[in-house]
């Protein structure tokens, strides 16, 4: 599996803001938006392009645009925070949704929503979720995408745990990973260490509805 770690001073500074427990919801959202745009920029590096004629105020020339913009698929809830940054970089992208919550007792994903095109054959898919911990949620999402015909899937995560990266690599699913960092371990509650806490709670506040 191809893994790209975005090693850049601006990415590192935004990640530090997100890690800091003193950062409030608004500050966390702002840092996530900046870092999300950087990761989408890197994930888009190899997208196919096409040229077309364009006229500047001075002369005619050739412009460039994406040949086939990807579909952005956030894993709800925390993945929603990465949609606007992705669309700021690729405004003509479509958006699908996969909803999953974590069972706090088993640490396993509990799916509750799928809103995706029936056929993803030939489509490039960016699956976005701030955290890759055990890999359970992301593996479930990527399998859903692959079952609908997707063979070009990029997982975009802010922070990835080595355990989740290994699970993704060993799955055999058609996926590459773009991330800002790979953290070494998970704690007994399956939170990434050092990580940044619960990304959904830090984006939107505590979830008070059991799914």
Curated annotation (Swiss-Prot):
**Cofactor-binding details, from the entry:** Binds 1 Mg(2+) ion per subunit. The magnesium is bound as Mg-PRPP.
Example GO molecular function? GTP binding
Superkingdom of this protein's organism? Bacteria
Gene3D superfamilies with a match to the protein in the record: 3.40.50.2020
What is stated about the way this protein's activity is regulated?
Allosterically activated by GTP.
EC code = 2.4.2.9
Query: Which Pfam family, any one of them, does this sequence belong to?
Result: UPRTase
Q: Which residues bind uracil?
A: 192, 197-199
Positions with a binding annotation for 5-phospho-alpha-D-ribose 1-diphosphate: 77, 102, 129-137, 198
Catalysed reaction per UniProt? Answer: UMP + diphosphate = 5-phospho-alpha-D-ribose 1-diphosphate + uracil
Going by the record, the broad EC class of this enzyme is transferase
GO biological process: one example: uracil salvage
Keywords in alphabetical order: Allosteric enzyme, Glycosyltransferase, GTP-binding, Magnesium, Nucleotide-binding, Transferase
Which pathway is this protein engaged in? Pyrimidine metabolism; UMP biosynthesis via salvage pathway; UMP from uracil: step 1/1
Which cofactors are reported in the record for this sequence?
A: Mg(2+)
InterPro entries according to UniProt: PRibTrfase_dom (IPR000836), PRTase-like (IPR029057), Upp_B (IPR034332), UPRTase/APRTase (IPR050054), Ura_phspho_trans (IPR005765)
Q: Which family does it belong to?
A: Belongs to the UPRTase family.
HAMAP family, per the entry = Upp_B (MF_01218_B)
Q: What does this protein do?
A: Catalyzes the conversion of uracil and 5-phospho-alpha-D-ribose 1-diphosphate (PRPP) to UMP and diphosphate.
Record-given protein name: Uracil phosphoribosyltransferase
| Species of the source | Corynebacterium diphtheriae (strain ATCC 700971 / NCTC 13129 / Biotype gravis)
Taxonomic lineage of the native organism: Bacteria, Bacillati, Actinomycetota, Actinomycetes, Mycobacteriales
């Amino acid at each position: 599996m191809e893994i790209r770690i975005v090693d850049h001073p601006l990415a590192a500074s935004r990640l530090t803001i997100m890690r800091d427990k003193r950062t409030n919801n608004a500050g966390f959202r702002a840092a996530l938006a900046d870092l999300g745009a950087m990761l989408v920029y890197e994930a888009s590096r190899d997208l196919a392009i096409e040229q077309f004629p364009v006229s500047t105020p001075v002369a005619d020339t050739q412009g460039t645009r994406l040949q086939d913009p990807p579909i952005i698929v956030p894993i709800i809830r925390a993945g929603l925070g990465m949609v606007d940054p992705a669309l700021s970089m690729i405004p003509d992208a479509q958006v699908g949704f996969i909803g999953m919550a974590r069972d706090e007792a088993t640490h396993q994903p509990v799916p509750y929503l799928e809103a995706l095109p029936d056929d993803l054959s030939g489509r490039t898919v960016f699956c976005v979720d701030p955290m890759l911990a055990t890999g359970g949620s992301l593996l479930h999402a990527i399998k859903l995408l692959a079952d609908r015909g997707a063979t070009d899937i990029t997982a975009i995560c802010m922070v990835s745990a080595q355990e989740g990266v290994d699970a993704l690599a060993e799955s055999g699913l058609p996926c590459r990973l773009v991330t800002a960092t790979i953290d070494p371990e998970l704690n007994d509650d399956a939170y990434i260490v050092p990580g940044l806490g619960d990304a959904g709670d830090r984006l939107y506040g505590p979830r008070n509805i059991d799914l």
